[in-house]
Regions:
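Donor nucleotide-sugar binding/catalytic pocket of nucleotide-sugar-dependent glycosyltransferases
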Residues: 1-18
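Short hydrophobic beta-strand element within catalytic cores of glycosyltransferases
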Residues: 131-134, 141
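Nucleotide-activated donor-binding/catalytic signature segment of Leloir-type glycosyltransferases, i.e.
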Residues: 70-96
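Glycosyltransferase donor-sugar binding loop
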Residues: 55-74, 91
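Conserved donor-binding/catalytic core segment of Leloir-type glycosyltransferases
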Residues: 19-36, 41-44, 48, 57
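Acidic donor-binding loop of glycosyltransferase active sites
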Residues: 103-117, 130
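A charged, aromatic-enriched C-terminal amphipathic alpha-helix characteristic of glycosyltransferases
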Residues: 155, 159, 176-211
Length: 211
């Protein structure tokens, strides 16, 4: 189909209400496993040697799409996650549960290897006031609007993992030394840019062209 015959409308979310983060540092990964979970696990394991009190919540399964069979290649990784004392593997849960978890999370740890065209997981984490650590890959720079902790992506897994570790280390260190940074500007941008109020008006205008 010619590009001139298409029309792009961005994603939208219901903003996550303002809240206080808990004292213990929590990281979260809440997207499907093929997007970078295999990089996150060893990096987090290494990070725990330096920060033994951090915790990672993993909400990840193709079951959310009804494709549970696609979890098969990742089951050994899921088992490793379950064994780790600093990781809780939750599998697939409702978006309501994810939004609750984001309110308790300090860092969205997302070493993406997937060519996103947009990323609702990132948008919701930004709205929740999380420090979002991710590469400048595909549409993530556009989605984040420059408000996140973004590093240069590399196709080599070891290089990617090392850069991801460095940025995660910096985020954890900042929280320990200075407390959770002021994220209201990030939240304001996200809640304004990706609000349903804004997006519904765009849809009304778009659909009005066919009236």
């Amino acid at each position: 189909m010619p590009y001139s015959h298409s029309h792009i409308l961005q994603n939208a979310i219901t903003p996550i209400k303002s809240h206080q983060k808990p004292n213990n540092i929590n990281l979260i990964y809440h997207t499907t496993p093929h997007r970078g979970l295999q990089i996150l696990y060893p990096v987090f394991t290494e990070l725990c040697k330096k920060y033994p009190d951090i915790h990672l919540d993993v909400y990840s399964s193709f079951k959310i799409y009804g494709w549970e069979q696609r979890d098969e290649p990742f089951k050994p990784l899921f088992e490793e996650l379950k064994k780790h004392p600093n990781i809780t593997y939750h599998g697939s849960v409702s978006n309501g549960k994810i939004r609750e978890a984001l309110q308790k999370a300090h860092i969205f740890a997302y070493p993406s290897i997937w060519q996103e065209t947009s990323c609702i997981a990132l948008i919701e984490a930004m709205s929740a006031g999380c420090i979002c650590v991710h590469p400048n890959y595909a549409a993530l720079p556009e989605t984040s609007g420059g408000w996140t902790s973004m590093y240069h992506w590399d196709e080599a897994p070891n290089i990617h993992a090392n850069r991801f570790y460095a940025y995660l280390d910096g985020a954890v260190k900042h929280i320990l030394q200075h407390g959770m940074p002021y994220m209201e500007n990030q939240k304001f941008y996200t809640d304004t840019m990706y609000s349903w109020d804004k997006r519904s008006k765009e849809w009304e205008q778009f659909l009005g062209n066919f009236g």
